[in-house]
């Protein structure tokens, strides 16, 4: 451990009462946020077990760390534990949750456990509708490069670390703050970042945008009076809220009045170059290994946080230049040689119209000569309904669109808010002819017919489409399957 990293005691030393807790159980342990907290706790020395409905890369990693993993939920699995951790995705009638309450076992929400981890640390909490995972990852990478040895909990795989969570030995904890269920109000960080604010997860906020705005202001007011709010002034709602924030504020963005400002933006392929201007400091000439203006904004947030903490410019420059990306955030899967020619496959998690638009813009800037083919999987019927016209507009911007069924995420279908309806509306708009694909088998038949030499193929969405991108890579984008089918014909 670096001599720059202040040795920090474990949770049970920071909070002596936590010594009473020996065995922690996670219901829904395979989620990225849940799995990250579980990984930190098992490395703190706690006995951990947990359940989920299916195996995943997260559950496999936790099992390797000694966590007992159950596939499926059963009341008997919680009988000998001291505390049960649940996410808001877990229904009230879950048998393990019901059993825990009957046995009078304390039940805490995921965000409450994260808040306990943050309570006696220097917390950096990253909130916002878009860009949380990338921004949190960039901050963690800068602090790591500066030998601050942070603990981090991220909603995606940090490629350089091979994990989405790590227990450091310093006082720093860098984590995503989840506004989807307003649970970020449990957190009491030292630094809060707000990347942007848009209408999403509106069921939580009773369809009231003003309530969403007020909740973000409340989140920032959880800062101590000596803390700092780092906010993106380019975002119109964030700019509107600044007069309501009663804490010290550092702004960032491309705007002329930003405290940390980007100039001279240029994207070449996957990376971006830009200049950073900060009041009273030398300009920074930077390159970040991420595409798109939106990722320059994410980088500015990390730079602002690091500058506040007096991290050396050299560490910032090196961390951004060497950044290896995050799983499913414009992740380059590979370049494939097929019967049609060379085709690049990229996988992206974005599932809100603004996120999809940013991804399309980054692809156009980085590879302007390539035709953009998107396989899109809508995520949740409610989001499709609430943002329907925005989806129609954004998805019409690609050259070729294949549409999968909606990934329900536990929701019941909503009439008029499904993939077939989206396809009809996009077709009427007249910019692109969408193709509805009912199954993976159909996709592997259709895709080789559509692809052309030089295409950039983008798999886009937050559901099971991430697994699809891997299977496409394994089948050479469906061309291997097509050859097999021809031989068997």
Curated annotation (Swiss-Prot):
Which molecular-function annotation in GO is an example for this chain?
A: UDP-N-acetylmuramate-L-alanine ligase activity
Q: What is its EC number?
A: 6.3.2.8
Q: In which pathway does it act?
A: Cell wall biogenesis; peptidoglycan biosynthesis
Please provide the record's keywords in A-Z order: ATP-binding, Cell cycle, Cell division, Cell shape, Cell wall biogenesis/degradation, Cytoplasm, Ligase, Nucleotide-binding, Peptidoglycan synthesis
**Main location class:** cytoplasm
Positions with a binding annotation for ATP: 128-134
Q: Give the reactions, separated by semicolons, that this protein catalyses.
A: UDP-N-acetyl-alpha-D-muramate + L-alanine + ATP = UDP-N-acetyl-alpha-D-muramoyl-L-alanine + ADP + phosphate + H(+)
Please, which domain of life does this record's source organism belong to?
A: Bacteria
Q: Which Pfam families match?
A: Mur_ligase, Mur_ligase_C, Mur_ligase_M
NCBIfam families attached here? Answer: murC
Its family remark reads:
Belongs to the MurCDEF family.
Recorded protein name is: UDP-N-acetylmuramate--L-alanine ligase
Q: Which organism is it from?
A: Shewanella pealeana (strain ATCC 700345 / ANG-SQ1)
């Amino acid at each position: 451990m670096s001599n720059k990293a202040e040795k920090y005691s474990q949770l049970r030393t920071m909070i002596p009462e936590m010594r009473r807790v020996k065995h922690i159980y996670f219901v829904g342990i395979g989620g990225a946020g849940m799995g990250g907290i579980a990984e930190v706790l098992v490395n703190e020395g706690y006995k951990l077990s947990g359940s989920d409905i299916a195996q995943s890369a997260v559950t496999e990693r936790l099992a390797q760390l000694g966590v007992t993993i159950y596939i499926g939920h059963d009341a008997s699995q919680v009988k000998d534990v001291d505390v049960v951790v649940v996410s808001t995705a877990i229904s009230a009638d879950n048998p393990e949750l019901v059993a825990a309450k009957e046995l009078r076992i304390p039940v805490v929400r995921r965000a409450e456990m994260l808040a306990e981890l943050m309570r006696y640390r220097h917390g950096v909490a990253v909130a916002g509708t878009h860009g949380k995972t990338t921004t949190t990852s960039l901050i963690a990478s800068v602090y790591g490069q500066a030998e601050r040895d942070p603990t981090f909990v991220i909603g995606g795989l940090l490629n350089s670390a091979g994990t989405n969570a790590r227990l450091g030995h310093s006082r720093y904890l860098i984590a995503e703050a989840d506004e989807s269920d307003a649970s970020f109000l449990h957190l009491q960080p030292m630094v809060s970042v707000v990347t942007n604010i848009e209408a999403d997860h509106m069921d939580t906020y009773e369809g009231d945008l003003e309530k969403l705005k007020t909740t973000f202001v409340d989140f920032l007011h959880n800062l101590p009076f000596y803390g700092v709010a780092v906010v993106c002034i380019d975002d119109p709602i964030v700019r509107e809220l600044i007069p309501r924030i009663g804490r010290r504020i550092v702004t960032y963005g491309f705007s002329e009045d930003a405290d940390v400002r980007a100039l001279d933006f240029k994207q070449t392929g996957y990376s971006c170059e830009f200049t950073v201007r900060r009041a009273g400091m030398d300009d920074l000439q930077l390159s970040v290994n991420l595409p798109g203006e939106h990722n320059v904004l994410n980088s500015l947030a990390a730079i602002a946080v690091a500058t506040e903490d007096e991290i050396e410019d050299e560490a910032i420059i090196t961390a951004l230049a060497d950044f290896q990306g995050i799983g499913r955030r414009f992740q380059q899967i590979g370049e494939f040689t097929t019967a049609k020619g060379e085709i690049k496959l990229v996988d992206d998690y974005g599932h809100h119209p603004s996120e999809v638009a940013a991804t399309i813009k980054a692809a156009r800037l980085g590879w302007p000569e390539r035709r953009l083919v998107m396989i899109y999987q809508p995520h949740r019927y409610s989001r499709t309904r609430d943002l329907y016209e925005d989806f129609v507009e954004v998805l019409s911007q690609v050259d070729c669109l294949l549409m999968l069924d909606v990934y329900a995420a536990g929701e019941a279908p909503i009439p008029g808010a499904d993939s077939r309806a989206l396809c009809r509306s996009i077709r009427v708009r007249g910019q692109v002819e969408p193709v509805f694909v009912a199954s993976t088998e159909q996709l592997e038949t259709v895709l080789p017919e559509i692809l052309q030499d030089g295409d950039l193929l983008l798999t886009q969405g937050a559901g099971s489409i991430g697994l699809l991108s891997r299977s496409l890579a394994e089948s050479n984008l469906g061309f291997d399957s097509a050859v097999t089918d021809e031989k068997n014909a």
